Structures are given as C-alpha cells and as structure tokens.
From Swiss-Prot:
The keyword Hydrolase does not apply. Keywords: Cell adhesion, Cell membrane, Disease variant, Disulfide bond, Glycoprotein, GPI-anchor, Immunoglobulin domain, Lipoprotein, Membrane, Repeat, Signal. A lipid is attached at N322 (GPI-anchor amidated asparagine). It comes from Homo sapiens. Disulfide bonds join C57-C115, C157-C202, C244-C296. Residues 39-126, 136-219, 223-310 form the Ig-like C2-type domain. Binds opioids in the presence of acidic lipids; probably involved in cell contact. The gene is OPCML. Its main location: membrane. This is Opioid-binding protein/cell adhesion molecule. The keyword Disulfide bond applies. It is a lipid-anchor; GPI-anchor. Gene3D superfamilies: Immunoglobulins.
Length: 345
C-alpha cells in the first residue's frame, strides 16, 4: 500500500497534501495506546484469511485532521485515499469515528496499523495490530507404502496455518480409543508387525477452522500361516470336503498333495477351489482309496507353510496320528521347485 495512487493529481496539489500530512504525522512522534488524552485505545483485530477486517478509530470534536497508516505507509488521510490497493476502503468518517476496511485479508496484511489525529495543534496516535488467522492445510504427506514385516517405516505430514497447527497421527485400523499414535509431523515405526498395517490418519488442527485430514495406507507383507485345517470324516459314497485357510500378504497360493502326488481338479473325481484365504479339496463320491492324509501347502514370495489334514471313514481313530496308518509328511520348497515325501512307519 502506498501513495502512488495519487500520481494523477496535479503536482501542486500533491505537494500541498504531502506537507499537510507531514504536519499531521511528524517524524519521531511516539505511538501512544491508551493515552488519557486520546479518546479511546484500540484492541487488536483478529480475522481469518479471506475475510474483511474493520479498523475503527474513536475520535471527538477536538480532532481537526485524521489518517490511517500501515507502518509508514499512508492508507487514508481524511476522505483522501492514498493506498492503491482496491481492497482498502473508508467506512466511516464522522466527528466521532474514523474507520476503514480491508477486504479479502491475506497474511501479508498482518501487522501494526496506526490511527493518527491532530488535536489542538498536537498530533496523537493509537495503534492496533491486525492478526490474520489461516486454517490448517496439509501441504505434504507420505504416499501409500508397502513393506515387509520387520521393516522400519517413517511417515511424514507437513502442515501450514496460523497459528501453527498441531499435527497428530492416528492408526485407524484398531479398536476405537486405541488409535492414538503420535503428536508430531513424523511417525516412525520400527520392526513393523502385520497388525500395524492399515490406514493412518494425519490431522492438522489450529482451532481456526475444521482440521485438515489426510490418510496414508501401510501394507505389511508377511509369509503364510495356516489358521484353519480340520480333519474330516465321511462315509464311502458320500461327498467329502477338506478345507485349508491361510493368512498371508500377498495372498497365498495353494497346492494339495496326497503322499507324493500333487492333486489337481478333475483327478479321480476331485475338485480344488481357491477363494481368497480359503482352499477346499472336494471329493464328490468318496471311496476307500480316498481315505488318508492330505497336505495343504500355502506359498507366497516371503515363504511357505503346510498342514496335514486327514480324510477318514466311520470308526477311524484320529488323534493327530492315525493308529492304523501312521505317516509323516515332509515338504521342501525352493522357488518353484517343490519336493514331497511321504514316509510310512
């Protein structure tokens, strides 16, 4: 804001006005807020970015001249506008009040503003400080990330605002009330576990407006483990189903074996069906030769695991090792090579 807006005035008029203002606000005059001889001290004005700020100066009939300044820049002198900023307008100029408005306030408008008056040939001033508040805004946040279990992870969330916002990280994929993680721009997780996967929420708050919230997803890879594998009893001629459930990220791939033979859909009236975490081996018409131990193998890029499941008939004793036909299944997996040995004893 400056005096250049009146360069279109005749130069003589400009000189006269300049001299009058020099007389009005002489160099070295101290700022006095709350002076007993000044009509009224002014409180600080606080507005949000984008709103309008009204600066009010209470005066009386002793005032002969009055002006508003921003630091050393003249905005208005009486009804004469010196600022070239179209956002600055005069609201009231009466014997009791002299007020201006700054529209669409921005952060660079923040600072001291001075109301200067001339009374009884003595200049007096009162200062008001304009405070501009800015809602919180997250400017930079980490992207979604995939890591292996046991790795270290650092998430970043940078936010701006006035006052400076408080940044909080929270894990959303846990029970309510247990999701608080940290109150910092950086979230560091060492030796990450599979139950620490999921969405993490960054919230920036400064009480000026609603918090700015962004989310980051962490995917934790881990090798398979079989969570459900149950022996099944069924009579000859009936339908029998063996099921095998495995948790893994990425999703596990399943294979079924009986002794040293890898099974496939269509082999001897069997069907293998894989759906997500579950794999089933279905016998549509169980015969005596179908009874025995079967091995479910779950594999992903981080490792493998297996479980032995028994299909048995009526009267069979199953206690983990069949008393009629004890067996030990051993599996070695390396890359895509899988060797299967079935040892009876």
């Amino acid at each position: 804001m400056g005096v250049c807006g009146y360069l279109f005035l005749p130069w003589k008029c400009l000189v006269v006005v300049s001299l009058r203002l020099l007389f009005l606000v002489p160099t070295g005059v101290p700022v006095r807020s709350g002076d007993a001889t000044f009509p009224k001290a002014m409180d600080n004005v606080t507005v949000r970015q984008g709103e309008s700020a009204t600066l009010r100066c209470t005066i009386d009939d002793r005032v002969t001249r009055v002006a508003w300044l921003n630091r050393s820049t003249i905005l208005y002198a009486g009804n004469d506008k010196w600022s070239i900023d179209p956002r600055v307008i005069i609201l009231v100029n009466t014997p009791t009040q002299y007020s201006i408005m700054i529209q669409n306030v921005d952060v660079y408008d923040e600072g001291p503003y001075t109301c200067s008056v001339q009374t009884d040939n003595h200049p007096k001033t009162s200062r008001v400080h304009l405070i501009v508040q800015v809602p919180p805004q997250i400017m930079n946040i980490s992207s979604d990330i995939t890591v292996n279990e046991g790795s270290s992870v650092t998430l970043l969330c940078l936010a701006i605002g006035r006052p400076e916002p408080t940044v909080t990280w929270r894990h959303l994929s846990v029970k309510e009330g247990q999701g608080f993680v940290s109150e910092d721009e950086y979230l560091e997780i060492s030796d990450i576990k599979r139950d620490q996967s999921g969405e993490y929420e960054c919230s920036a708050l400064n009480d000026v407006a609603a918090p700015d919230v962004r989310k980051v997803k962490i995917t934790v890879n881990y090798p398979p483990y079989i969570s459900k594998a149950k022996n099944t009893g069924v009579s000859v001629g009936q339908k029998g189903i063996l099921s095998c459930e495995a948790s893994a990220v990425p999703m596990a791939e399943f294979q079924w074996f009986k002794e040293e033979t890898r099974l496939a859909t269509g082999l001897d009236g069997m069907r293998i069906e894989n759906k997500g975490r579950m794999s089933t081996l279905t016998f549509f018409n169980v015969s005596e030769k179908d009874y025995g131990n079967y091995t479910c193998v779950a594999t992903n890029k981080l490792g493998n695991t297996n479980a032995s499941i028994t299909l048995y008939g009526p009267g069979a004793v199953i206690d983990g090792v069949n008393s009629a036909s004890r067996a030990l299944a051993c599996l070695w997996l390396s890359g895509t090579l899988l060797a299967h040995f079935f040892i009876k004893f």
